[in-house]
From Swiss-Prot:
The keyword Nucleotidyltransferase applies. Poorly processive, error-prone DNA polymerase involved in untargeted mutagenesis. Copies undamaged DNA at stalled replication forks, which arise in vivo from mismatched or misaligned primer ends. These misaligned primers can be extended by PolIV. Exhibits no 3'-5' exonuclease (proofreading) activity. May be involved in translesional synthesis, in conjunction with the beta clamp from PolIII. Residues 6-187 form the UmuC domain. The gene is dinB. This is DNA polymerase IV. It comes from the Bacteria.
């Protein structure tokens, strides 16, 4: 089994957390994000106060209100969730480019080759959790393990707002006690069948030969045999092509005016240029942009086609972006849109320069 360092990051009740962050009046009471009970709406997610009443994701809103009559259901704001997800992924990319998103609020990271914290996946996960909390004011749970299967289980082990680590030396003992219902790919039907066969834990499952499991479960029996031993060779796939590269910084003290923001630009641009220099040649930097998040979490992005990537161009963009809010700033970001050259052919100039 190859020794890798995989982190699974899962935001805690993500949609609900964003809503409670943006409207503190929602915190401390049962609330959910979902559709109207009058129109066969469904709960997308809910906070932990609502879960105490038995409310769950994918439950009909009508049934959720029967369980919890005081439940407040708010309409989803997907653009706000997408923006928060983009900010989280910006943090991820400081540590690795091997990121496999599973949804807006969940992703695998392969940090096997990361140089951060001398390659300590545990310290990287701790830093990610700290930065997300400081930057977005929401919590995430994380699991660290030698493979995806175990990392995902680990992230759920100490939810919410927890971190759990399974080291290579702990895999055999940890997996042996694991209920087979927790295995990746085991649904209710398979779990019921395993129970009828007297298989409750992975230790029981190890008593079955590979051939016997294949006879009983078909091709999935091969995977069951491996999972019972903590084996999962699936790679972290980063199939999506990037549309931009950027750096952001959340300041401990709000920047009070434009002059304070402009003073931070040189350091941000230096970090951006370092990141651009590490990119492969299949990307071409294009439009520059600036992002400003004000102290009240409102934000704006300003970009301009044809503008340069020099300090003065970014100063002008920042000035225009700041003018849209004119309030103290908690976060500044600078970046550039990318042209994806992979598989594309650059058009030759009709009259090349002499």
């Amino acid at each position: 089994m190859s020794l890798r360092k995989i982190i699974h990051v899962d935001c805690d009740c993500f949609y609900a957390a964003i809503e409670m962050r943006d409207d503190p009046r929602l915190a401390g009471r049962p609330m959910a994000v979902g559709g109207s009970p009058d129109h066969r709406g469904v709960i997308a997610t809910c906070n932990y106060e609502a879960r105490a009443y038995g409310v769950r994701s994918a439950m009909s809103s009508r049934h959720a209100l029967k369980l919890c009559p005081d439940l407040l259901i708010v309409k989803p704001r997907f653009e706000a969730y997408r923006e928060a997800s983009r900010e989280i992924h910006t943090i991820f990319r400081d540590y690795t480019e091997l990121i496999e998103p599973l949804s807006l609020d969940e992703a695998y990271l392969d940090v096997s080759d990361s140089q951060w914290y001398s390659g300590s996946a545990t310290r990287i996960a701790e830093d990610i959790r700290r930065r997300v909390a400081r930057t977005l004011h929401i919590t995430v749970s994380a699991g660290v393990a030698p493979n995806k299967f175990l990392a995902k289980i680990a992230s759920d082990w100490r939810k919410p707002n927890g971190l759990f680590v399974i080291t290579p030396n702990e895999v055999e003992t940890f997996v042996a006690a694991l209920p087979v219902a927790r295995l990746h790919g085991v649904g209710k039907v398979t779990a019921d069948k395993l129970t009828r066969l007297g298989i409750e834990t992975c230790l029981h499952l190890r008593e079955w030969s590979r051939l016997a499991l294949v006879r009983e479960f078909g091709s999935f029996g091969e995977r069951l045999w491996g999972l019972a031993r903590g084996i999962d060779e699936r790679a972290v796939h980063n199939d999506s092509r990037r549309q931009s590269v950027s750096v952001e910084n959340t300041y401990d003290t709000d920047l009070p005016d434009l002059a304070s923001c402009l003073a931070r630009l040189p350091d941000l641009l230096a970090s951006l240029n370092e990141r651009i220099a590490r990119m492969d040649s299949s990307y071409l930097p294009d439009k520059p942009f600036v992002k400003v998040k004000f102290h009240d979490f409102s934000q704006t992005t300003m970009e301009q086609a044809g503008a340069g990537r020099d300090l003065e161009s970014y100063r002008q963009l920042l000035g225009q972006a700041f003018a849209r809010g004119g309030k103290p700033v908690r976060l500044l970001g600078v970046g550039v849109r990318l042209r994806d050259l992979r598989g594309a052919h650059e058009q030759l100039e009709l009259f090349p320069p002499k």
